[in-house]
């Protein structure tokens, strides 16, 4: 029999009608001579009632046999409940069962199918198809679908063209490691799964498409954390003939539309803008969380003449003030903060507390000569805790930025109802890599340098600035973009600055450089992390909660056991031989 409707959509207006529902048994219980069954489908729960006194004997027998997660088909009449359950959308009604069929049975599940499940992450991922039955998870994916639907409608209305770009591409250096795919036809050669459609979308601008978008899978072989996965989805945009402000305006409109449609939130436009340098110096992060204060303060000049070499001789001394919470931090808890700080390169963590109107702590005795000025500069008050880092400016910023976020979480200082968007602009073009011993692209090698700094491509690379912009939400990088290079000579200079010889530049990017001989228009774009955006909209702290079949922190899938070994015959066809390190 055809299903009449979803169980979770039955309401008082359906009283007196006969309907057929299909779904899973969430719970069955016997009470007062009646059999109550909670039927669950993707839209919610509906209570079914079997009365042995007037129900068919076969129906009663079937009802008695039901266990959790059995799949059933039920037909009956909608009736008003004697006692309504205000906690359920269907709580005013119940279904008097007239016919009941078991469509499939189920073993006892490894965890209960309900929100707030107590199961390890590995167990949830091993039985992901069960985990996804939970109402909370279903809601996450309804939200995700609504977000993508809204994005497509918005961009379609602005005459963007949805174009699919290749999944099998050329491996190019820079950025994260590629996932490689061996070619059977051209043995010894490899495709790469795209880290982004960067070059192909630029080529679409050269083709005259003018406005492109794609909701696209991307792949990066990098270390994983809560907001990263080896395969992820981004909303990819590229435009011709627009400046950075126009691209940002389009992006803000898109985000405002999504926020209104999915959360009912009206965001204020335009979004605030903050330079990269201000973000690093004041927040210790290029993706600052502006929902709380506790800004970094520079004390380098103030402490340069005190009798404490650790401060006086350090390239930079910076501090944060934890207002009104010194009593919550014992020496033991500060030692934990010190260990945390060392993860970011700091040699240690100095601290003082304001207690009974005076500074107290291990370094307080070295600060007596500047105590009044220090107290005034930092606005230190009773029961404040001050944390100092003395090191290079980079380490001081990074360490205190991480401490700022950690302490805000510990003290519950963050208003999780806020959505604070901002643009981080005026980026450096390059960043120094200690591992590589050279400058690397802060974004990618195709970013346009500012006109007034491009001359430094043959000089001091630290002075080259990029026409680049990142969009940040609540301390997460939501996406980033830039204007792109469209002049061949400038692109060649950029690649040379990154250490490419002319030969290697053409070997890797010859097709792009050749395209620049054929009227490449000015262009720019942006990519937004869809998984991360939906994660934040859903109020989650791990993107696995909004990806249907994610990988764990070892880039493995406990359900399918991917990645897995393959047969020798498959390797032979690819002319590959695998030697494991432990063999």
From Swiss-Prot:
InterPro entries, per the entry: Aa-tRNA-synt_II, aa-tRNA-synth_II, aa-tRNA-synth_II/BPL/LPL, Asp-tRNA-ligase_1, Asp-tRNA-ligase_1_N, Asp/Asn-tRNA-synth_IIb, AspRS_core, GAD-like_sf
Subunit structure: Homodimer.
Subcellular location: Cytoplasm
GO MF terms held by the record: aspartate-tRNA ligase activity; ATP binding; catalytic activity, acting on a protein; nucleic acid binding; transferase activity
Record-listed L-aspartate binding positions: 174, 220, 443, 484
Pfam families with a match to the protein in the record: GAD, tRNA-synt_2, tRNA_anti-codon
Function, in words: Catalyzes the attachment of L-aspartate to tRNA(Asp) in a two-step reaction: L-aspartate is first activated by ATP to form Asp-AMP and then transferred to the acceptor end of tRNA(Asp).
Descriptive protein name: Aspartate--tRNA ligase
Organism: Streptococcus thermophilus (strain CNRZ 1066)
NCBIfam families, alphabetized: aspS_bact, PRK00476.1
């Amino acid at each position: 029999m055809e299903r009449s409707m979803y169980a979770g959509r039955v309401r008082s207006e359906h009283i007196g009608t006969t309907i057929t529902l299909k779904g899973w048994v969430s719970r069955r219980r016997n009470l007062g001579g009646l059999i109550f069954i909670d039927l669950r489908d993707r839209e919610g729960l509906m209570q079914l009632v079997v009365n042995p006194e007037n129900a068919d004997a076969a129906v009663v027998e079937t009802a008695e046999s039901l266990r959790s997660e059995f799949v059933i088909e039920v037909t009956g009449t909608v009736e008003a409940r004697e006692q309504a359950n205000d906690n359920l959308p269907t709580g005013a009604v119940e279904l008097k069962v007239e016919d009941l069929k078991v469509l499939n049975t189920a073993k006892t599940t490894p965890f209960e199918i309900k929100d707030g499940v107590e199961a390890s992450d590995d167990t949830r991922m091993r039985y992901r198809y069960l985990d996804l039955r939970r109402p909370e998870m279903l809601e996450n994916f309804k939200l995700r679908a609504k977000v993508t639907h809204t994005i497509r409608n918005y961009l379609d209305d602005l005459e963007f063209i949805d174009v699919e770009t290749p999944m099998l591409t050329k491996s190019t250096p820079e950025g994260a490691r590629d996932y490689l795919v061996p070619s059977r036809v051209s043995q010894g050669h490899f495709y790469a799964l795209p880290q982004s459609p960067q070059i192909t979308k630029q080529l679409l601008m050269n083709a005259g498409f003018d406005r492109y978008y794609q909701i696209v899978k991307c792949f990066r072989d990098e270390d994983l954390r809560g907001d990263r996965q080896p395969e992820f989805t981004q909303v990819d945009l590229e435009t011709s003939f627009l400046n950075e402000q126009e691209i940002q305006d389009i992006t803000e409109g898109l985000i405002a539309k999504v926020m209104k449609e999915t959360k009912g939130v009206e965001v204020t436009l335009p979004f605030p803008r903050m330079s990269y340098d201000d973000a690093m110096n004041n927040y210790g992060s290029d993706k600052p969380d502006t929902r709380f204060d506790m800004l970094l303060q520079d004390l380098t000049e103030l402490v340069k003449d005190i009798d404490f070499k650790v401060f006086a001789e350090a390239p930079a001394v910076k501090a944060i003030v934890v207002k009104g919470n010194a009593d919550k931090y014992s020496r033991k808890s500060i030692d934990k903060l010190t260990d945390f700080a060392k993860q970011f390169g700091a040699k240690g963590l100095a601290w003082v507390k304001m207690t009974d109107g005076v500074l107290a702590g291990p370094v307080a005795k070295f600060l007596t000569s500047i105590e009044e000025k220090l107290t005034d500069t930092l606005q230190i008050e009773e029961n404040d805790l001050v944390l100092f880092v003395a090191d290079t400016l980079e380490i001081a910023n990074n360490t205190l930025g991480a401490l700022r976020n950690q302490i805000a979480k510990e003290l519950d200082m963050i208003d999780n109802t806020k959505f604070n968007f901002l643009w981080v602009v005026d980026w450096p073009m390059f960043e120094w890599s200690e591992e590589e011993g050279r400058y690397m692209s802060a974004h990618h090698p195709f970013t346009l340098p500012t006109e007034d700094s491009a001359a430094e491509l043959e000089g001091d690379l630290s002075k080259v600035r990029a026409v680049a912009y990142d969009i940040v939400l609540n301390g997460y990088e939501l996406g980033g973009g830039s204007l792109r290079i469209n002049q061949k000579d400038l692109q060649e200079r950029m690649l040379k600055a990154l250490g490419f010889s002319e030969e290697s530049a053409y070997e890797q990017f010859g097709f792009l450089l050749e395209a620049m001989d054929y009227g490449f228009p000015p262009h720019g774009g942006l990519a937004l992390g869809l998984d991360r955006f939906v994660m934040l909209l859903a109020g989650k702290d791990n993107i696995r909660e909004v990806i249907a079949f994610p990988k764990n922190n070892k880039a493995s899938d406990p359900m399918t056991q991917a990645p897995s070994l393959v047969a020798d015959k498959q390797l032979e066809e690819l002319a590959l031989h695998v030697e494991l390190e432990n063999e």
